Amino acid sequence: MDPQYARLVKAAALSATVLASILLIIKIFAWWHTGSVSLLAALVDSLVDLAASLTNLFVVRYSLQPADEEHTFGHGKAESLAALAQSMFISGSALFLFLTGFQHLASPEPLQDPGLGIWVTLIALFSTLILVTFQRWVVRKTQSQAIRADMLHYQSDVMMNGAILIALALSWYGFHRADALFALGIGAYILYSALRMGYEAVQALLDRALPDDERQEIINIVTSWPGVIGAHDLRTRQSGPTRFIQLHLEMEDMLPLMEAHILADQVERALLHRFPGADILIHQDPTAVVPKERHAHWEL
């Protein structure tokens, strides 16, 4: 396990947990004083944020454990489970927002002290922007699915806080249904984000292949290597930070076993240089045993 990967994902998960805890306390105070349904929506979302970020923190720590006798491929899929759990948390909060929004749309109430709500929302907006910027940088460095899911979650929070600001301002000027309307819009966006996040997590758990551009890079590296006649049966997947790459190399029929082994090792090192930490399995085939329709065949 790359020490930098472990350090970055732990820092990102811990930062999200701390921020969610602070914002939850602030929003409870603000909602109590204003009665805003949009702030209630933000409060519920912060509660879900905290639960999701705590889950993320513990799961990320577990996923970083090295492979053992019972989990020979490591614990990386725990990240996908964390993302799936987050999608469920977020879906639940979206449904709550729909119910509350419809209730207040039918019976709108004037807000108490909307100025306080605006200040609290501004604090939440800028602090969440800082967190999302940090998380995006971590995802760019690590490709962590759990942190990417958390980042998508907090990106929806940024949108939500912006919408709440508009709703509070409109309510201040007498348009009291704006609060409920924006709560419904926020709920719809959060539900969409949750469904997208859940889909990505399920695809990872089902061992979806690596993206087309990465598989094309693998093909380019292998087929351009001196001594490699062709290749077939490329299989790829990703579990946590680890990419798994399997393929068959086609070589000269009479190539000595030691030379075939050395050639396969060279290809493996070239792939590891491009995809550090990857788990690579290469099978060597003499061209005579490969059916004609499979020569130099790759499934993309």
Swiss-Prot record:
Membrane topology: Multi-pass membrane protein
Record's keyword annotation contains Cell inner membrane: yes
Catalytically driven reaction(s): Zn(2+)(in) + H(+)(out) = Zn(2+)(out) + H(+)(in); Cd(2+)(in) + H(+)(out) = Cd(2+)(out) + H(+)(in); Fe(2+)(in) + H(+)(out) = Fe(2+)(out) + H(+)(in)
A GO BP annotation: intracellular zinc ion homeostasis
UniProt cross-references to SUPFAM superfamilies, sorted A to Z: Cation efflux protein cytoplasmic domain-like (SSF160240), Cation efflux protein transmembrane domain-like (SSF161111)
GO MF terms held by the record: cadmium ion transmembrane transporter activity; ferrous iron transmembrane transporter activity; metal ion binding; zinc efflux antiporter activity
Gene of this entry: fieF
One of the record's GO cellular component terms: plasma membrane
Protein name: Cation-efflux pump FieF
Pfam annotation, one family: Cation_efflux
Role according to the record: Divalent metal cation transporter which exports Zn(2+), Cd(2+) and possibly Fe(2+). May be involved in zinc and iron detoxification by efflux.
Family: Belongs to the cation diffusion facilitator (CDF) transporter (TC 2.A.4) family. FieF subfamily.
Keywords of this entry: Cell inner membrane, Cell membrane, Ion transport, Iron, Iron transport, Membrane, Metal-binding, Transmembrane, Transmembrane helix, Transport, Zinc, Zinc transport
Organism per entry: Yersinia enterocolitica serotype O:8 / biotype 1B (strain NCTC 13174 / 8081)
Coiled coil: none
Secretion signal, residue range per the UniProt entry: none
Subunit structure: Homodimer.
Entries under InterPro entries matching the protein: Cation_efflux, Cation_efflux_CTD, Cation_efflux_CTD_sf, Cation_efflux_FieF, Cation_efflux_TMD_sf, CDF_Transporter
Cellular location(s): Cell inner membrane
Binding site for Zn(2+): D45, D49, H153, D157
Membrane spanning residue stretches: 12-32, 40-60, 82-102, 114-134, 164-184
Keyword Cytoplasm: no
